[in-house]
């Protein structure tokens, strides 16, 4: 059979497997590629091809991740799977692999375990919007009541971390049976096919960057005689059109101005779109009113804040991080988008110190406001050297 060409027309959705070690995340990942390729076409990937995940560097942090893809009739899925627990922590905090939804794999034989809980918590902290559950190894459980008990435990756990536990879809099956092409009692290929159909139905199509409200981090500011002030940067999302009002947010008080021109490679354009590097000409704005680290945004869509709770991964010594722990009162720089802002760290109750290689929840108070929203990623730096990575989990003020 001739290979089908890759259909760009289908919407693209990013997913990933999460859950406790040895509950079957990688087996399920392999089974997903196998079942989809048989039912709907595409490439099947063997277990070994996923398990020996290549290491990649994201913001100087070494993460082992496997990427596979599969297709349903209506979507193209890009799926990430990590070999070790530490890789999940780094992956989710740095946002190296942003997930539109996660597949929580939980062994029906063991029930929820410590990493099951930790991955659900991380998903909540870093803003993974949807979780679908695959209750794996169900062929090893003869007792129907035991299955129901495990299902209830998983639902409780999801509810504890503000996911809709009662309404979360749970598919019961065996990834191994599916991988071997078996389907005893509908636990194998049927269950995995049902999982994909559930992903299609339960995870909404993600909004594309271009459809979101305009935002551009300011990288540079120029004054052009006779024309005014130009700010440059890469449009993060949305579209800015000539004649539209924009806000300058962060560091100082928020101000409003109008975009009077957009240029790219010295050519004048009507608009700047997500992903493009552009210069935006601002009406009546003085060179000193704007600085790197602020953002240009559609009015009313983003606000400046100084105090927030974050989930942080501290680089290990091998990753070029600190060689020693830090304690409460630690004051590093927090690098948001294009600039560093000093901030004080408050550690959770009962945590005296944080070691390199740890992940920790901490409250940060910045000395200057930054345009932020939940889910914004940042780096922690000391004198220009990255020592940590984090994500804004909750904004306080």
Curated annotation (Swiss-Prot):
Q: Which domain of life is it from?
A: Bacteria
Name the segments for region: G2.
60-64
> Where, subcellularly, is it found?
Cytoplasm
Q: What segment(s) does the record annotate as region G5?
A: 174-176
tr-type G domain location is 10-207
* Region listing for G1, in residue ranges: 19-26
An example of a Pfam family matching this protein is: GTP_EFTU_D2
**What GO cellular component entries does it have?**
cytosol
Transmembrane in keyword set: no
The family database entries (InterPro entries) matched by this protein are listed as: EF-Tu_GTP-bd, EF-Tu_GTPase, EFTu-like_2, EFTU_2, G_TR_CS, P-loop_NTPase, Small_GTP-bd, T_Tr_GTP-bd_dom
Q: Where does GTP bind?
A: 19-26, 81-85, 136-139
Its assembly, as annotated, is: Monomer.
Q: Please describe what this protein does.
A: GTP hydrolase that promotes the GTP-dependent binding of aminoacyl-tRNA to the A-site of ribosomes during protein biosynthesis.
Family classification: Belongs to the TRAFAC class translation factor GTPase superfamily. Classic translation factor GTPase family. EF-Tu/EF-1A subfamily.
Q: What is this protein called?
A: Elongation factor Tu
Please name the source species: Hahella chejuensis (strain KCTC 2396)
